[in-house]
Amino acid sequence: VKNLLRRVLQSAYNAVSHGSYNERLLEENVWHHVFRESFRTTQWKSELALSIGRWAGGASFFYILHRVLEDVKPEKVVELGLGESSKLISSYASNEDWLKSHIILEHSKTWIAAFCDRFQLSENSEIRRHDLFGKTQNCGFTDSLRYRDIEIDIWQHATLVVVDGPFGSESYSRMNSFDFIRQLLPESRFVLILDDSHRVGEKETLTEIRNLLSAQKITYHEKEYGGMKSCTIVCSHHFPWLASL
């Protein structure tokens, strides 16, 4: 009887997991279609090659990033982690005069060299290399992995912050985003996009971001967008429509 019950429970678990996977895969395909149809509207966009998914952001992430760039037109963007999203933001910096500054934080000299061999960044894009400290496992609020020694002026006047680095931590993942939130004022115009928000570490980070915003009496909107991976947007009251894309 116990073996039969165990097999029944395992079958039920497999069915739920399989169904969830299929639902996420279907949602991912829809996001791919939505992004493709909304993005390929000019020659430079049609010529931009992006590898979406796996270590890079998913289709929902790229659609949300594209919409924020189009709708908000940020003059300054700070990006945590060098990758496919850097191509998209830098291409906007090359082709749109409203994007004046794009700062990318990255820790790996090898990856920076490999990326720059394959892609020419805009003159308005700048990579700043910062070492990492902390750890990804058995960590907490004080010792999760993050970039070291980020100057406070990096965050000043940034309207958009994209968080897709460094590597995720089990707890309080990608905590450098707190430094950006702490320097905001109640009337600051801002958008923060956090990738991989389906993971526990990123969920803990989002909880702390909410706590910080509330403590600073900052009104904000928040929305998670799904697919094979999830990303979450947190924005000031100036951009309420970003929570219903």
For the regions a protein language model found, what residue spans apply to each?
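SAM cofactor-binding core of SAM-dependent methyltransferases
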Residues: A56-F133
